[in-house]
C-alpha cells in the first residue's frame, strides 16, 4: 500500500469552488503486457520507456522540473522485498503463499507517522490481518523540482498477511480496511487528513506515482530501476493538469484505472451517487455501510471519483470491463454492428434505466491484477492505438511508436474506436476484443426479458386544440407567470412557425439581471457553462448519432445487485411532454401524485423558506407511501389573488436537494407541470436541477392562441407564413425546444440528457447563499446577491401586476432583446452610436467627451460599473505619462471574419490598426494575399488599383491583419496565411456563443469569399463547435507547437471565454506554451447566434480576467504570458479597469464596428446590412461610409483618455498599473434588487500583495526548443536546395517524439517564395514512427515519405506537396487491415496529396478543402464538413460519413454493402459512378496511389477493374451534384 497527500495546491478557491469545478487534466496513458512469458524486468523498463516517450503529452510546473504527475501500476515487487530480507520472505517462495499477502502504498507526512501506524494497527487487528512489515520506499529527493520538493510526502509501504483469505476475497477485505483507515484518519487534525493518501492496497498490484516528469519517475523511485523488479503487465500515465500546483495524490494511475480526458457530468454523477448510497444498506455491503459511505468526494478530481465508483463495482463482484460498460456506455442506439449482437443492446437498455453515464472524452486504461485493458468514450475523443505481436507482447497507448517492437513480429496494429474496449486476461493469457468482451458480459442476465416485462413507453399523443381565453385573460396569465411581449412574439411564436430557436446578432448589451432595474425571472441569474480546451463541444446536428434526449421515469434500484423489477420504468423519447401525455402517466404501473406549488401569498408567521420546506416534506411523505412519480404543478383553474406559485426552478431544486440529503432521491422521479417555462434555457435549468420531464402547459396554450389569432391565419393564407395545423405549430415549438436542449448539452460536450439530468452545469450570478443552499447546492455563486426574501418580494410584485383593474390588451415590451426607448437599457443605444459617429468623423474632442459621459454616467450594466478608482499617489502632469503611441500599441480589434464583414470593412479595420501600431484580427476565413504587401499603387487622386473599393488610403498603408485567426473551420488557413502573421490566434470560443460552431450562410459566400475559403460560391459553410485537433489541454499544446513550427516569429494567442474555472484552464494554456491568453466576455458581438446563447452563456470578462490573473500569479506563471481582454470595451476608463485587473492588451469589437460606420441594425445574419458593413451584397457594400481615419480618430481619443486617467492617478504608464487591483473601491450605489452583492472577487481574490505581482518581461515569442526540422535545416544540402530551388533526397530516422515534422521547412519556403513559386523538390525519406502533426502545413515542393506509421493530425493544413506512408517492408501482415494513421488527418487541408497504405482513424479529411487522398480504411465521421478535394477509401469505414459535407468528392469501396447505413444523408447522397469522367478520376488517382505505395489492395482492384468498379460509391454533396448533372446531360445528348 502506498500513501500520499500533500494538498498544497495554490489554485484559488473563488467563493467556495468545489475542487471538481477547478480540477481539469489530460495526459498520455497506456498499458503493456506479455502473454506468453513469465514476469520480467523488461516489462517494467518498457513501460517506463513508453512513459518517457509521451513526456510531451504531460505538463510541468513553473520550475520546468516538477511534473504535473507521472506513475505506473505494476505487480508487487516481491523479489525486491525478498532481497531486503524482510522476515516473512521464506513464505514467498511459493506462488500460492503470495496470494494471502497484500501491500499498501502510502503517501503521507512524516510528522505524524506514529499516529498513522497506530491507526493501521487498530484497523488490521479489527479485520484480523497480520502486520508483517513497514517499509520506507527508497527515493532520490535530489531530482525533485522546487514545487514537487515542497510538497513531497513520505512514501511508505505496509505489508500485511491474512491467514484465511486469498485473491479477490482478500482484496475485498483490504478495500474495507483501507476505507476504515481513511475514516479514522479523517477524524484527526485537518493537516494530517489532507496529507494522507493510500495509493493502492492490493494483493496483486501496486502504484508508484508522484509530481514528477516521466523520465524522473524511475530516478525518484529506486525500486523501478532495480533489475529484480518483475511484472507481466504495466499501466502508465503522464498527466497534464490545468491546476498548476498538482497534488501528489492526483497523479495517476489511480487504484484501478488511469484516465485521459474529462468527465463533464461529474457534479450530477456525484449527486446521484450520493442519493443511491443508501441502497448499500440493503445489499452485500449492509454491514459496512458506515465504513464505505461516502463512496465519492466532492473534493476529489473526476478521475479519482470515477475510480472510486469503479472500485466499488469491482469489489462487488464485477469485472472492470462490465463496470465500465455500465459507467461509460457506447452510443449503442445508432451502431449498425450491434444488429449482430442484440443481447449487448439489451444490456445497455437495462442499465440506462439505472445509471446515468459518466460522460465526456475518456480513454480509460484499467487493471485489477487479473485483467488489464482499455475502453474509449462514446464519441472516440481520445486516441488509443495498439500493437500485438506473435510472441505475445501487447501495447496500447495514446500514441503509437512508444514501445520497441520488431516489425517482423507484428500481428495486428489497430485502434480503439468510439465506445470500444480491448483487454487482456492475464490469468488465461488471452486478448479479448470488443465484441467478445461485451457479448460475454451481456449474457449474464436475461436483460431483454426484464426490460420487456417491466418497462413501458410513453406514446406521443395529440396536442390540445382548444383555446378558451380572450386576450385580456391570456395577458393576465402571461403577466402572472412573467412573460413579456418579446417572449411571446420573438421566442414562442418564432418557434411555433419555424421549429427553430430565434437567431440574433451583435451580442448582449443589457445590464446583468442583478444590476437591472427591470424584473427578471430566477432563470436569468444562471449562466450556462460550456466546453473549452479541456474537452470538446459536440455538433448536435451532424453528430446526432451519439446524442439522445431519452429519459426514464421511475425509481432506481441497487445497480450492484441487478434484478428484473429494477427495469420498472416509463421511457420517454423527449423530456418535453404535452398535457395529454402528462395525463397518460397515470395509466402505467408506476404510482403518480400531483403536488401543488401554489402557496399563500400572505406568509404571516411562516417564512417563504418554511413554505418551500413544507412542500419538500410533503414529497417525503408521498415517497414513504410508495409514490414513484411526483408531479410538481402550478396549474390551476383560476388564478388566485391570495396565492402565488413557487418558481418551478426554485421548487424543483429544493425538492431535489432535500431528497438527496434524505437519501430518497433515487426512489422517485420529478415531473414539472408549469406555466413558467418557455425558452430552451428554462428547460435546461429545470432538467439540470432534477426534473425528468416538463409539461409547459402555458407555452403550449400560447402557441394555440397564436395559431387561432386572425392575423396568423391571414399570414398563412397569403403565404407569408407556412401553412400549419394547430398540431404542427405545437409540434414545431416542441421540436425547437428539443433542438435547443441538444445544443445546450452539446456545448458542454455532453451527449445524453440522462447525463445532463441533475448535473447542475451552470454558474450563478447574483443569488445569495441561502438560495443556493436551499435549491442549488454545489452550484457556485461568486457574487452572492438576492436573498430568498428578496426573490419572494420581487416575484410578488410581478405576480400582483396580473390583478390590476385595467390589464393591458398587449403585454409590455421591456426591451430585453431589442432596444426600445424607456425599456431596458442598452449600452449600444442610438444616442451613443450617433454621438460616436459624429465624434470620429469630425475628429471632435467635445463630442467624444459627450460620448464618454454617456457611457461613464450610465446606470450600472456590468460589474465593473460598480467600481471606482482610488490612488496612492499625487496627480502628475500628462506630459510625464507615456505617449499616445505606446498606449495604441496595446489595442487590437476582435476577430471578425471576411465573409461576416464586407471586404471594405475588413480591410479598412486592418489598415487603420496598422497605421496606429495596433493589431487587427482577421477572424476566421483567410485573407487575400494581395493584402500581405503595403499599398504602393495610389494615383494622384489617392485611389489604388488593387484596392479601388477603398477610400482615404495613403502610400505604405498595409491591409494585412497582424493577428491571423485559426478557428475550428480552418477556412483560409494556408502556409502563406500563417507566415504572414505577427500573431496567430487560436479561437477556442466566442463570447456571444461559446461552445458552438458557426455558419456562414450561402448567400454571404460570394465568389470572392469562396475563393479565399477554398469552397464553392453560394454554399453554406459550417465551422464545427470544436477544433477537431483540440479535445484536451495536451492537444491544444500540440497546436500551439505546430503554429510555432510554421511561423517561429509569430506569437501564439489562445482566445477563451470567461466562465467558472477559467483560471485553471488559463494555467494549462500557459503551460502549453502560449504567448498570449485572451479573455472574452459574454457580451461580445456576433454575426449570428441563438438568442439563448447570447443571453445565457458565458460570464463577464471582469470575473474571468480577475480569476485568470490571480491564478497565474499564485502559480508563478503570470510572467509567461500576455493577458488580453475583450468584450464591451468602449472607453479609456474601461482600459484602466481592465489593466488593474491584470490585462496588458485590449480588444475592441462592437465599438470599432460602430466607429467604422455600423448603425447597430442587428441584421448581420441576414446579409442585409443597410450600410455595407456586414454584407456581401455589392449594392449595399457601395454604401459603406467608413474610411481608415475614422477609426484611427476613435483609438486616439481612447488612448488620450487613458493618459489623462493615468495622470490623475499619478502613474506614468499602463505597465505600472497592471494587476494593482487594490486601486479599486466599491461605489456607493444602491441597487434596486439587493444590497448583498459581493465584488471581492474583482479586486482582492488573493489579498494581493504587490510584491507578488511579477514584473512582466515577456519573451518576444516562445520557442519549441531544438526539433527535427531544425536539425534538417542545419544541413547545408537542404538549405542549398531551398535557396537554389533544386532537388534533394535525404534519409532520416523518426520517433514519435518528433512532432510536426515538415512545418518549419514549409514555413521557410513559403516565406521566401510565397504560395506557389518554389520550384525545387525536397524528398525526405523517414523510417520509424512519426509523432503528431506529421506533414502539417507543408507546401509545394515538399515530399515526405514514411516507412512506418504515424500518429494523429497527419497532413493537417497541408497546402501542397505529398505525404506517402507505407508499412515497413519486413511487416508480414496485410497492410490494408492495419492502422497506419491516427485521428483527424488531412484536417483543413487546402492542397497536396496524402497516400497511406493502411487504415486511418476517426474524422479523416474533416474540413478538407482541397486535399487529395487515398487510404485503405477510416473510422467514424470521415469527410465531415468537407468543402473540396478528393478522397478515396479502399477498406472498412465507420459511421456518419459525409456529415456536413458541402463540397468535394469521395469514393468508397463498399465490399460488404454497409455504406448506406453509415452515410449521413442530411446533405450528401451516395450514387454509383455514373459518368466516364468519374471513372477516370477514380482510376487516375488509384493508379498514382499504387505507384507511390505499392499497395497490394490497389493493385488487386486495378487488375480487376470492372469487377471492383461496381462496388464503388461516389459521395456527392449538392454543390457537386449540379456539376455531375450537367456532365450527364452532355453525355446523353452526345451518345444517346
Curated annotation (Swiss-Prot):
Binding site for FMN: 1105-1162
Necessary cofactors: [3Fe-4S] cluster; FAD; FMN
GO cellular component: chloroplast stroma
Domain spans labelled Glutamine amidotransferase type-2: 27-427
SUPFAM superfamilies given in the database record: Alpha subunit of glutamate synthase, C-terminal domain, FMN-linked oxidoreductases, N-terminal nucleophile aminohydrolases (Ntn hydrolases)
Gene for this chain: gltB
Gene Ontology MF term list: 3 iron, 4 sulfur cluster binding; glutamate synthase (ferredoxin) activity; metal ion binding
UniProt keyword annotations, A-Z: 3Fe-4S, Amino-acid biosynthesis, Chloroplast, FAD, Flavoprotein, FMN, Glutamate biosynthesis, Glutamine amidotransferase, Iron, Iron-sulfur, Metal-binding, Oxidoreductase, Plastid
PROSITE patterns given in the database record: GATASE_TYPE_2
Binding residues for [3Fe-4S] cluster: 1158, 1164, 1169
Cofactor note: Binds 1 [3Fe-4S] cluster.
Catalytic EC class: oxidoreductase
Entry protein name: Ferredoxin-dependent glutamate synthase
Reactions the enzyme catalyzes: 2 oxidized [2Fe-2S]-[ferredoxin] + 2 L-glutamate = L-glutamine + 2 reduced [2Fe-2S]-[ferredoxin] + 2-oxoglutarate + 2 H(+)
E.C. no: 1.4.7.1
Location of the active site: 27
Pathway assigned to this chain's UniProt record: Amino-acid biosynthesis; L-glutamate biosynthesis via GLT pathway; L-glutamate from 2-oxoglutarate and L-glutamine (ferredoxin route): step 1/1; Energy metabolism; nitrogen metabolism
Superkingdom classification of source: Eukaryota
Subcellular location per the Swiss-Prot or TrEMBL entry: Plastid, Chloroplast stroma
Amino acid at each position: 500500500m502506498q500513501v500520499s497527500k500533500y494538498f498544497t495546491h495554490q489554485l484559488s478557491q473563488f467563493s467556495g469552488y468545489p475542487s471538481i469545478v477547478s480540477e481539469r487534466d489530460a495526459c498520455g496513458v497506456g498499458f503493456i503486457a506479455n502473454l506468453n512469458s513469465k514476469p520480467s524486468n523488461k516489462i517494467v523498463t518498457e513501460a517506463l520507456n513508453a512513459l518517457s516517450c509521451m513526456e510531451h503529452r504531460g505538463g510541468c510546473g513553473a520550475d520546468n522540473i516538477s511534473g504535473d504527475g507521472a506513475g505506473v501500476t505494476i505487480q508487487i515487487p516481491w523479489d525486491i522485498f525478498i532481497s531486503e530480507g524482510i522476515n516473512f520472505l521464506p513464505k514467498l517462495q511459493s506462488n500460492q503463499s503470495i496470494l494471502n499477502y497484500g501491500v499498501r502504498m502510502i503517501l503521507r507526512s512524516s510528522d505524524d507517522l506514529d499516529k498513522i501506524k497506530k491507526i493501521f494497527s487498530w484497523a488490521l487487528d479489527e479485520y484480523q490481518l497480520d502486520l508483517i512489515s513497514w517499509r520506507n520506499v527508497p527515493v532520490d529527493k535530489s531530482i525533485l523540482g522546487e514545487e514537487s520538493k515542497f510538497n513531497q510526502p513520505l512514501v511508505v509501504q505496509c505489508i500485511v498477511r491474512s491467514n484465511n483469505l486469498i485473491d479477490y476475497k482478500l482484496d475485498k477485505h483490504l478495500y474495507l480496511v483501507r476505507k476504515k483507515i481513511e475514516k479514522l484518519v479523517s477524524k484527526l487534525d485537518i493537516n494530517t487528513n489532507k496529507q494522507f493518501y493510500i495509493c493502492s492496497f492490493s494483493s496483486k498490484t501496486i502504484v508508484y506515482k508522484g509530481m514528477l516528469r516521466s523520465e524522473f519517475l524511475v530516478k525518484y523511485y529506486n525500486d523501478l530501476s532495480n533489475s529484480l523488479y518483475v511484472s507481466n503487465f504495466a499501466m502508465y500515465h503522464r498527466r497534464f493538469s490545468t491546476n498548476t500546483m498538482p497534488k501528489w495524490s492526483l497523479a495517476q494511475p489511480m487504484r484501478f484505472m488511469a484516465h485521459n480526458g474529462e468527465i463533464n457530468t461529474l457534479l450530477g454523477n456525484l449527486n446521484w451517487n450520493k442519493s443511491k448510497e443508501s441502497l448499500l444498506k440493503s445489499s452485500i455491503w449492509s454491514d459496512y455501510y458506515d465504513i464505505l459511505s461516502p463512496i465519492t468526494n466532492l473534493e476529489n478530481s473526476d478521475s479519482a471519483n470515477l475510480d472510486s465508483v469503479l472500485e466499488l463495482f469491482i469489489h462487488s463482484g464485477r469485472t472492470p470491463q462490465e463496470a465500465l460498460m455500465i459507467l461509460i456506455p457506447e452510443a449503442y442506439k445508432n451502431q449498425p454492428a450491434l444488429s449482430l449482437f442484440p443481447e449487448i443492446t439489451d444490456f445497455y437498455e437495462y442499465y440506462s434505466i439505472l445509471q446515468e453515464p459518466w460522460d465526456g472524452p475518456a480513454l480509460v486504461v484499467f487493471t485489477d491484477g487479473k485483467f488489464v485493458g482499455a475502453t474509449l468514450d462514446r464519441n472516440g475523443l481520445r486516441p488509443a492505438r495498439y500493437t500485438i505481436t506473435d510472441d505475445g507482447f501487447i501495447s496500447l497507448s495514446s500514441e503509437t511508436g512508444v514501445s520497441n517492437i520488431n516489425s517482423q513480429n507484428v500481428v495486428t496494429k489497430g485502434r480503439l474506436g468510439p465506445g470500444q474496449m480491448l483487454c487482456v486476461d492475464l490469468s488465461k493469457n488471452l486478448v479479448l476484443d470488443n465484441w467478445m468482451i461485451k457479448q460475454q458480459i451481456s449474457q449474464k442476465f436475461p436483460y431483454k426479458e426484464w426490460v420487456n416485462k417491466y418497462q413501458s413507453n410513453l406514446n406521443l399523443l395529440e396536442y390540445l386544440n382548444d383555446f378558451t381565453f380572450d386576450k385580456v385573460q391570456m395577458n393576465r396569465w402571461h403577466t402572472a407567470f412573467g412573460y413579456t411581449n418579446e417572449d411571446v412574439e420573438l421566442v414562442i411564436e418564432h418557434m411555433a412557425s419555424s421549429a427553430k430557436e430565434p437567431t440574433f446578432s451583435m451580442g448582449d448589451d443589457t445590464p446583468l439581471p442583478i444590476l437591472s432595474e427591470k424584473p427578471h425571472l430566477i432563470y436569468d441569474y444562471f449562466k450556462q457553462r460550456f466546453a473549452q480546451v479541456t474537452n470538446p463541444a459536440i455538433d448536435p446536428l451532424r453528430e446526432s448519432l451519439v446524442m439522445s434526449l431519452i429519459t426514464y421515469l421511475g425509481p432506481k434500484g441497487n445497480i450492484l445487485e441487478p434484478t428484473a423489477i429494477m427495469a420498472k420504468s416509463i421511457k420517454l423519447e423527449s423530456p418535453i411532454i404535452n398535457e395529454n401525455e402528462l395525463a397518460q402517466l397515470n395509466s402505467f404501473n408506476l404510482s403518480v401524485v400531483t403536488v401543488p406549488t401554489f402557496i399563500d401569498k400572505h406568509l404571516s408567521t411562516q417564512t417563504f423558506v418554511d413554505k418551500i420546506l413544507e412542500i419538500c416534506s410533503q414529497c417525503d411523505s408521498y415517497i414513504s407511501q410508495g409514490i414513484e412519480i411526483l408531479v410538481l404543478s402550478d396549474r390551476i383553474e383560476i388564478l388566485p389573488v391570495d396565492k402565488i406559485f413557487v418558481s418551478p426552478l426554485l421548487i424543483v431544486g429544493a425538492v431535489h436537494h432535500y431528497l438527496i440529503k434524505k437519501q430518497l432521491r433515487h426512489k422517485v422521479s420529478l415531473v414539472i407541470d408549469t406555466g413558467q417555462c418557455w425558452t430552451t434555457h428554462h428547460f435546461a435549468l429545470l432538467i439540470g436541477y432534477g426534473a425528468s420531464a416538463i409539461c409547459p402547459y402555458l407555452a403550449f396554450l400560447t402557441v394555440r392562441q397564436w395559431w387561432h389569432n386572425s392575423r396568423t391565419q391571414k399570414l398563412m393564407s397569403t403565404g407569408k407564413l407556412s401553412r400549419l395545423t394547430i398540431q404542427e405549430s405545437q409540434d414545431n415549438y416542441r421540436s425547437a425546444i428539443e433542438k435547443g436542449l441538444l445544443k445546450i448539452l452539446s456545448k458542454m460536450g455532453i451527449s445524453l440528457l440522462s447525463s445532463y439530468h441533475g448535473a447542475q452545469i451552470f454558474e450563478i450570478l447574483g443569488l445569495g447563499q441561502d438560495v443556493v443552499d436551499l435549491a442549488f447546492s454545489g452550484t457556485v455563486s461568486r457574487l452572492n446577491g438576492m436573498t430568498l426574501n428578496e426573490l419572494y418580494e420581487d416575484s410578488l410584485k410581478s405576480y400582483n401586476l396580473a390583478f390590476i383593474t385595467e390589464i393591458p390588451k398587449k403585454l409590455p415590451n421591456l426591451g430585453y432583446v431589442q432596444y426600445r426607448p424607456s425599456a431596458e437599457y442598452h449600452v449600444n443605444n442610438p444616442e451613443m452610436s450617433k454621438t460616436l459617429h459624429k465624434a470620429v468623423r469630425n475628429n471632435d474632442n467635445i463630442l467624444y467627451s459627450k460620448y464618454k459621459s454617456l457611457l461613464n454616467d450610465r446606470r450600472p450594466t456590468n460589474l465593473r460599473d460598480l467600481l471606482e478608482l482610488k490612488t496612492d499617489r499625487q496627480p502628475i502632469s500628462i506630459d510625464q505619462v507615456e505617449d499616445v503611441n505606446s498606449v495604441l500599441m496595446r489595442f487590437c480589434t476582435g476577430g471578425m471574419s471576411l465573409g461576416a464583414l464586407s471586404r471594405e470593412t475588413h480591410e479598412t479595420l486592418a489598415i487603420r490598426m496598422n497605421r496606429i501600431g495596433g493589431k487587427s484580427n482577421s477572424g476566421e476565413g483567410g485573407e487575400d494575399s494581395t493584402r500581405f504587401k503595403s499599398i504602393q499603387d495610389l494615383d494622384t487622386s489617392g485611389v489604388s488599383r488593387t484596392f479601388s473599393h477603398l477610400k482615404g488610403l495613403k502610400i505604405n498603408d498595409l491591409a494585412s491583419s497582424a493577428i491571423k485567426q485559426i478557428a475550428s473551420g480552418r477556412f483560409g488557413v494556408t502556409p502563406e496565411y500563417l507566415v504572414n502573421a505577427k500573431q496567430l490566434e487560436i479561437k477556442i470560443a466566442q463570447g456571444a456563443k461559446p461552445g458552438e460552431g458557426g455558419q456562414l450562410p450561402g448567400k454571404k459566400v460570394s465568389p470572392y469569399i469562396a475563393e479565399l475559403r477554398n469552397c464553392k460560391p453560394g454554399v453554406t459553410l459550417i465551422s464545427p463547435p470544436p477544433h477537431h485537433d483540440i479535445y484536451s489541454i495536451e492537444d491544444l499544446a500540440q497546436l500551439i507547437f505546430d503554429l510555432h513550427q510554421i511561423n517561429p516569429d509569430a506569437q501564439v494567442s489562445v482566445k477563451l471565454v470567461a466562465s467558472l474555472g477559467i483560471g485553471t484552464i488559463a494555467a494549462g494554456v500557459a503551460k502549453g506554451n502560449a504567448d498570449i491568453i485572451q479573455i472574452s466576455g459574454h457580451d461580445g458581438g456576433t454575426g449570428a447566434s441563438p438568442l439563448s446563447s447570447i443571453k445565457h452563456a458565458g460570464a463577464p470578462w471582469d470575473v474571468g480576467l480577475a480569476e485568470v490573473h490571480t491564478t497565474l500569479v499564485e502559480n508563478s506563471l503570470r510572467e509567461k504570458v500576455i493577458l488580453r481582454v475583450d468584450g464591451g470595451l468602449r472607453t479609456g476608463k474601461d482600459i484602466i479597469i481592465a489593466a488593474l485587473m491584470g490585462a496588458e492588451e485590449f480588444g475592441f469589437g462592437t465599438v470599432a464596428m460602430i466607429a467604422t460606420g455600423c448603425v447597430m441594425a442587428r441584421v448581420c445574419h441576414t446579409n442585409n446590412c443597410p450600410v455595407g458593413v456586414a454584407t456581401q451584397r455589392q449594392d449595399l457594400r457601395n454604401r459603406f461610409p467608413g474610411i481608415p481615419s475614422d477609426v484611427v480618430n476613435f483609438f486616439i481619443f481612447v488612448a488620450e483618455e487613458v493618459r489623462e486617467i493615468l495622470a490623475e492617478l499619478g502613474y506614468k504608464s499602463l505597465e505600472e498599473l497592471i494587476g494593482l487591483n487594490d486601486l479599486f473601491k466599491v461605489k456607493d450605489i444602491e441597487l434596486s434588487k439587493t444590497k448583498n452583492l459581493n465584488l471581492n472577487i474583482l479586486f482582492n481574490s488573493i489579498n494581493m500583495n504587490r510584491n507578488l505581482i511579477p514584473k512582466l518581461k515577456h519573451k518576444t515569442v516562445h520557442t519549441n526548443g531544438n526539433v527535427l526540422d531544425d536539425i534538417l535545416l542545419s544541413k547545408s544540402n537542404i538549405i542549398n536546395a531551398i535557396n537554389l530551388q533544386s532537388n534533394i533526397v535525404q534519409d532520416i530516422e523518426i520517433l514519435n517524439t518528433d512532432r510536426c515534422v515538415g512545418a518549419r521547412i514549409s514555413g521557410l519556403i513559403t516565406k521566401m517564395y510565397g504560395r506557389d513559386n518554389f520550384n525545387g523538390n525536397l524528398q525526405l525519406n523517414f523510417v520509424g514512427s512519426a509523432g503528431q502533426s506529421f506533414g502539417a502545413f507543408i507546401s509545394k515542393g515538399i515530399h515526405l515519405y514514411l516507412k512506418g506509421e504515424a500518429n494523429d493530425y497527419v497532413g493537417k493544413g497541408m497546402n501542397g506537396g505529398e505525404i506517402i506512408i507505407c508499412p515497413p517492408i519486413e511487416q508480414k501482415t496485410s497492410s490494408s487491415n492495419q492502422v497506419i494513421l491516427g485521428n483527424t488527418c488531412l484536417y483543413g487541408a487546402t492542397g497536396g496529396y496524402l497516400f497511406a497504405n493502411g487504415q486511418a482513424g476517426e474524422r479523416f479529411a474533416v474540413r478538407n478543402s482541397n486535399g487529395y487522398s487515398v487510404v485503405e480504411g477510416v473510422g467514424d465521421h470521415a469527410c465531415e464538413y468537407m468543402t473540396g478535394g478528393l478522397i478515396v477509401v479502399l477498406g472498412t469505414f465507420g459511421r456518419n460519413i459525409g456529415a456536413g459535407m458541402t463540397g468535394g468528392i469521395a469514393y468508397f469501396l463498399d465490399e460488404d454493402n454497409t455504406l448506406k447505413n453509415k452515410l449521413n444523408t442530411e446533405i450528401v447522397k451516395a450514387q454509383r459512378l455514373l459518368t466516364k469522367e468519374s471513372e477516370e478520376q477514380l482510376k487516375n488517382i488509384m493508379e498514382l496511389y499504387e505507384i507511390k505505395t505499392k499497395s497490394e489492395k490497389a493493385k488487386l482492384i486495378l487488375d480487376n477493374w470492372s469487377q471492383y468498379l461496381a462496388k464503388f460509391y461516389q459521395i456527392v454533396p449538392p454543390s457537386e451534384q449540379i456539376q455531375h448533372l450537367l456532365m450527364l446531360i452532355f453525355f446523353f445528348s452526345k451518345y444517346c
